[in-house]
């Protein structure tokens, strides 16, 4: 998925502390969002920046920074942020929210992952599962 990201980088006086140097060998992340007005927000790595009115694009070193920044943006009632992984080859992958709905929201179409329809008292004996060759979530 070679997607072109657009937007202005927020204004901040400072540096990333060398965190983006790993992007040359590994990967970097980008978060995009749309702001109704220019306002100051806290960066997940420390410090503050001023977002632009309209589209914003910020490159970050870790996905966790994007999740934390998303929490900061929600304080401003901005919920349309998206997080992308960018490989050194230039390949861009959309990673959050993966199915378009944030994890803490209910999505009727979302499939349950590793779900067993039983109570904890109905779980099998761990000693019987250990050497059976089955994974614990399949037992």
From Swiss-Prot:
Pfam families: PsaD. It is a peripheral membrane protein. SUPFAM superfamilies: Photosystem I subunit PsaD. GO terms for biological process: photosynthesis. InterPro entries: PsaD, PsaD_sf. One of its GO terms (cellular component) is plasma membrane-derived thylakoid membrane. Its main location: membrane. It is found in: Cellular thylakoid membrane. Keywords: Membrane, Photosynthesis, Photosystem I, Thylakoid. The cyanobacterial PSI reaction center is composed of one copy each of PsaA,B,C,D,E,F,I,J,K,L,M and X, and forms dimeric and tetrameric complexes. Belongs to the PsaD family. PsaD can form complexes with ferredoxin and ferredoxin-oxidoreductase in photosystem I (PS I) reaction center. PANTHER family: PHOTOSYSTEM I REACTION CENTER SUBUNIT II, CHLOROPLASTIC (PTHR31982:SF5), PHOTOSYSTEM I REACTION CENTER SUBUNIT II-1, CHLOROPLASTIC-RELATED (PTHR31982). This is Photosystem I reaction center subunit II. It comes from Nostoc sp. (strain PCC 7120 / SAG 25.82 / UTEX 2576).
């Amino acid at each position: 998925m070679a997607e072109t990201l657009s937007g202005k980088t927020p204004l901040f006086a400072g540096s990333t502390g060398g965190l983006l140097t790993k992007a040359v060998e590994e990967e970097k992340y980008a978060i995009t969002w749309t702001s109704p007005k220019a306002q100051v927000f806290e960066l997940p790595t420390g410090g503050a920046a001023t977002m632009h009115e309209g589209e914003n694009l910020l490159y970050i070193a870790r996905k966790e920074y994007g999740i934390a920044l998303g929490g900061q943006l929600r304080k401003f009632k901005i919920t349309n942020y998206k997080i992308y992984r960018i490989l050194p080859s230039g390949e861009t992958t959309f990673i959050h929210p993966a199915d378009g709905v944030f994890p803490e929201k209910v999505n009727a179409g979302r499939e349950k992952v590793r779900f067993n329809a039983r109570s904890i008292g109905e779980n099998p004996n761990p000693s019987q599962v250990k050497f059976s060759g089955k994974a614990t979530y399949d037992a």
